[in-house]
Structure formats: structure tokens, C-alpha cells
Amino acid sequence: MTYLLALDQGTSSSRSIVFNAQGQVVAQAQQELTQIYPQPGWVEHDPLEIWRTQLATAREVLAKAGIEAREVRALGITNQRETTVVWSRKTGAPIHNAIVWQDRRAEPTCVELRARGLTPTVQAKTGLLVDAYFSGTKLKWILDHVPGARQQAENGELAFGTVDSWLIWQLTHGTVHATDVSNASRTMLFNVHSNQWDDELLRALDIPAKLLPAIKPSSALFGEVSPDLLGAAIPIGGVAGDQQSALFGQACFKPGMVKNTYGTGCFMLMHTGHSFQSSANGLITTSAAQTTAQPEFAMEGSVFVGGAVVQWLRDGLRAIPSSSEVQALAESVPDAGGVMVVPAFTGLGAPYWKPDARGTITGLSRGSTLAHIARAALESIAFQSAALLQAMSRDAVQAGGSAVAELRVDGGACVNDLLMQFQADLLGIAVVRPAVIETTALGAAYLAGLATGVYRSTDEISTLWQAERRFLPALAPARAAELMEHWEHAVRQTVL
């Protein structure tokens, strides 16, 4: 039997999953990760806790699977993107907590970069917006605020990495300092056309090149896990940021194929092949997971509050005792009764980009109940995702392609049948849930398997992907369009 081990290091937890060569889950293990909030708008993780929890789950999952490390053909890594770690090359000790992707402390740097007129340069070279979301400004903050850090960086004594680089360094006992193109593309320092760090961007942010990891394709040999950690030297064969890994795990290998991950937020990616397409509709362009040195691209849109709206129903409104009960409450009414919830708790992301927006509930009447609000909250996830897909379809058509024909879904909230059916109704296309919804970890396993000969090609991997259920639209297109108009009207009311 052939086994692949995926390390899935996320924002809220570290997970490890063992897959067989057919892409089926054999065993999994998970440990929560402590969230650190030093002040409003700041979010940190302890890099040593990231490593401890990830190693512990890797050991645990091998035991659960009843296998030894020598039976594992390859290891893949997928990770929360943009989160920034800086450590000593000599001791391996972090010089500061990891600054998490949600952290906004670097916004003043972004204001300065925009004022200097760098937005067009950043967008042309990286596909990204100038935003504190991305790693480059977080790295600059560490260099500017940790005593002695900038001088140590100039001397080549420090290493920077996103979470994948940090894990690779630990797994190889500091012998490998590397990242893949998908993670590099989230730093605002990486030229997605040349697949290299960009000197002009490094100068703009005053970041020494000596800090940076080597860049490899997502499917490549990054080194071997030190035998003392898991019991054998396992090749590290795949590395990708979580959303690009999910795109790969969904077997979205051809231009125009789209996946949406329904997690705390929602992340929609459309593969655009070897074509770099700038969005005219509020999306960003990013590197897709690459199996060769040739660049591959994806368009991406991010919804800040997806499944988190269900947590708000539970913890804020106390409408439900547990998240799993939201579907039953929402199904207790035939529709939302004209109620619209726009969960702009932290502003609105793509395609609106309204940082000043705040959450609203509109359309309330004396007949409105908690069930109507719960249904409207659940439907808000589908409305936001529909706005993303419509933006992607417009971009695709403007670039000479076709409108999106099918949406592949994954993430925790995709198990909610009511939500998936409403999503299909709004979009007017099939929404397809795969048999294996652990697609983020599966993508890392597939990438590792490709690099080590378990799979011959992405065509072979495509044959392994299986649908569990297809949700077909059951709503008249005119009614779906009317609902989207109501949604857009509600969105306009979120900014005072």
C-alpha cells in the first residue's frame, strides 16, 4: 500500500492527514492553535507552537493509521498564506511572534507605498493590491520594530519565511530554506512573470535579499524529513498555500475551472492556465500551484466572513446552541421572508473592497423571526460567493474565454445541503461537492505524489477526483437575478 502524508497548517489549528494513493483519507489528527491579540487589529501566532502542534499531529496520525514513517512515500505541506515568520539562521529561534495574515498593523506602510505611486507597479509585477494582508509589509514591520533585526538581516543572520518555509526548516533541521511559487506569490515581493524575487519591490520595502528562501515549483523535491523526527527520512515533495492547494486537490487543472472553499471566510479561485489576467472586476491574480518551472496563474476572490456568520449566530445572537443546528433552524421557514443579512463585520472583501462597510440586517418586519435571520445569514454566504463568481465570469468573457460552467466546492460549510442548493439556484450552474472534501490537504498530497512518481501526471490525478453530489439549479433565472439585485441593494446600505 502506498501512503502520502499531508501537513495542513491552518489559522486555527495544525492538522495532519494520511491518504492512500487513491486520494482517500486513511487517518487524521488535529490540534488547536492559540490566537494572540496584542492590541486591536493585531493577530499573532507563536512559531514554536505552530511547529510543536504540527509535529505532534504528524506523529499522532501515523499511529492512528497504524503505519510507520518508512511506509510513507512522500510528505506534502499546505499552509495558511501570508503569515510571516523571521528566525535566526544560527539558533533557529524566532525573533518575534508570527504576524498572521489577518493582522493590519502594517497599514501605515501601505498608505506610504500608495502615496509613492507604487500601486500600478505592484499590481503589474505581483497581481496583488498594495495591502497589509500580504507578507512584505509584515516583514518590513518586524525589521523596523525588533531591536537589531535590520542589522542582523543585512548581515545574513536571519531567515524569513511564510509558514511552509518555517516548517521545512524545522523538518530538515535547518538544512533547507525554501518556499514554493504559490506562497511566494502572496508576499508582494515576488514577480509572478519571472518566478523570482523582484529587486525593485525589495528596494521599495527596504528588505535585504539575504533574508529570502529559495523558490521551487509546488511539486518538487524540497529535501527530506530528518529521520529522528518521525522515524524515517520522508521526501518533502509538495508545498502550496492553502487555497492553491485546494484548487489542485479539486483537480481544477484547466483554464476556466473554479473552486470555492467555504471556511471561516470563502476563497474562490479560477485557474487561468499560463495566462496572466488582470481583473477589471475587483479580483486579484496569483500564482497557481505549479508542477513545472513554467508559470501558471489563478484569479482569486476572498470573502472575509463566510462560515463565521454561523459562529455569530451561535455566540453573538445566541440563536443556536451549536453551529451544526443552523440548517434545521433555517429550514424551519420556506425562505428568508425578505430579510437580508450582510455580514460586513470587518468590511467587505472582493469584489466590493469596502473596508469601512459594517454589518446590516435589512427587510425586517413584525413577522420576522430568528429562523428568518438564520436563513438570511446562511444565504449571505451564497450571495457573497455568487458576486465573486459573477465577477470571475465577466473577467473570463472579457479575456476571450467562456463563462464559468460548474463550481467545485469544499471546506466545512459545503456539507450544508441547504446552502449548496441555494448557491446553485443563485448561480444557475451545477455546484459539485467531491467525495473527499479535505481538498486542501489532498492537494498537498497529490503534489508530493507527483514529485515522487506515485502519479505520472495531472491527467491521472483527474481520474481520481469523484463527485459525491451535484446540486442543480431549481430556481427560475429571473428570480435568481431579482434576489441578487436585492442583495446588491443591501450591500450599498453597509456604508454610512
Swiss-Prot record:
Q: Which Pfam families match?
A: FGGY_C (PF02782), FGGY_N (PF00370)
Q: Does the keyword Transferase apply?
A: yes
Task: Recount the known activity regulation.
Answer: Inhibited by fructose 1,6-bisphosphate (FBP).
Q: Which residues bind glycerol?
A: R81, E82, Y133, D242, Q243
Which residues of this UniProt protein bind sn-glycerol 3-phosphate?
T11, R81, E82, Y133, D242
Keywords, A to Z? ATP-binding, Glycerol metabolism, Kinase, Nucleotide-binding, Transferase
> Its annotated pathway?
Polyol metabolism; glycerol degradation via glycerol kinase pathway; sn-glycerol 3-phosphate from glycerol: step 1/1
Q: Which GO terms describe its molecular function?
A: ATP binding; glycerol kinase activity
Tell me one GO biological process term. glycerol-3-phosphate metabolic process
Q: What is its EC number?
A: 2.7.1.30
Give residues annotated as binding ATP: T11, S12, S13, T264, G307, Q311, G412
Q: Which InterPro entries is this protein grouped with?
A: ATPase_NBD, Carb_kinase_FGGY, Carb_kinase_FGGY_CS, FGGY_C, FGGY_N, Glycerol_kin
Instruction: Please tell me one Gene Ontology term that the record gives under cellular component.
Output: cytosol
PROSITE patterns (UniProt xref): FGGY_KINASES_1, FGGY_KINASES_2
Major enzyme class: transferase
The UniProt annotation places ADP binding at T11, R15, T264, G307, G412, N416
Q: Which reaction does it catalyse?
A: glycerol + ATP = sn-glycerol 3-phosphate + ADP + H(+)
Function, as annotated, reads:
Key enzyme in the regulation of glycerol uptake and metabolism. Catalyzes the phosphorylation of glycerol to yield sn-glycerol 3-phosphate.
Q: Which family does it belong to?
A: Belongs to the FGGY kinase family.
What is this protein's name? Glycerol kinase
Q: Which organism is it from?
A: Albidiferax ferrireducens (strain ATCC BAA-621 / DSM 15236 / T118)
